[in-house]
């Protein structure tokens, strides 16, 4: 059984294709016998604060007398605790103007904290989030995978890697606005990727036993 942290960031709520594909991925894992324990956030409904100078300083350890700032630091601590307690992080990241949604960026601004999720060394930052892998679901109107127009993929790989999450899989639903058949093809491709990633729990367990000590968790 795995602890799964789910982050939905679409502004379109339940009509969002990204959110629907996340639900399908979680249902596929359940059908495969994983029995996940879910913690789910709709980031677009959380009204997360925008990073500004006082908040940035407080997140780096400065003492701020403002109650509102202290509340946000406490929220940051809570979100970080959720992340560190998870085995699998599922991120919904639809492409908006070539990048991630604003609310998802706000979440990262609260959890990517020096001395909490990464630390500086003499050569390179070291991630402090251990034993977590990530799956990103990203829908796009056009086809951007592997192109310079895709800022979503490199940003998420970089910020997750900064915190120590190196194993990141992407489920892309692309070309959704291409007519006449782009949407159907994009959804079919995403569902094929979901089927590939939703490996039956028994198969994962056998791999873990076979390749010990390289596999530490059944996720």
Regions found by a protein language model. Give the residues of each.
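A structural motif corresponding to the C-terminal end of an alpha-helix
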Residues: 82-87, 132, 163-168
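Residues at the starts of beta-strands that form the adenosine-phosphate
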Residues: 3, 37, 132-133, 167
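N-terminal beta1-alpha1-beta2 submodule of the flavodoxin-like/Rossmannoid cofactor-binding fold
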Residues: 1-93, 99-109, 113, 192-216
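Cofactor-binding loop segments of dinucleotide-utilizing enzymes, especially the Rossmann-like FAD-
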Residues: 9, 139, 173
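Gly/Ser/Thr-rich active-site loops/lids in small-molecule metabolic enzymes
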Residues: 111-117, 159
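Short, glycine-/small-residue-rich phosphate/pyrophosphate-handling segment
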Residues: 120-163
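Short histidine/acidic/glycine/proline-rich micro-motifs that form metal-
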Residues: 11-13, 141-144, 177
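Glycine-rich phosphate/pyrophosphate-binding loop and the adjoining helix
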Residues: 146-211, 215-219
């Amino acid at each position: 059984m795995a602890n799964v942290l789910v982050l939905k960031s679409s502004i379109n709520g339940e009509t969002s294709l990204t959110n629907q594909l996340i639900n399908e991925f979680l249902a596929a894992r359940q059908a495969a016998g994983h029995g996940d324990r879910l913690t789910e956030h709709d980031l677009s409904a959380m009204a997360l604060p925008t990073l500004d100078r006082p908040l940035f300083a407080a997140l780096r350890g400065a003492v701020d007398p403002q109650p509102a700032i202290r509340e946000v630091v406490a929220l940051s601590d809570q979100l970080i605790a959720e992340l560190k307690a998870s085995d699998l992080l599922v991120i919904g990241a639809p492409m908006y103007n070539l990048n991630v949604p604003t609310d998802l960026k706000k979440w990262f601004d609260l959890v990517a904290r020096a001395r909490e999720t990464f630390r500086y060394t003499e050569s390179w930052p070291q991630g402090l989030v251990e034993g977590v892998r990530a799956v990103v679901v990203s829908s796009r109107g056009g086809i951007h995978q592997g192109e310079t127009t895709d800022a979503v993929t490199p940003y998420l790989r970089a910020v997750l890697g900064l915190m120590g999450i190196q194993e990141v899989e992407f489920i892309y639903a692309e070309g959704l606005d291409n007519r006449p058949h782009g949407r159907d093809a994009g959804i079919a491709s995403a569902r094929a990727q979901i089927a590939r990633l939703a490996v039956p729990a028994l198969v994962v367990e056998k791999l873990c036993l076979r390749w010990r000590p390289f596999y530490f968790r059944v996720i």
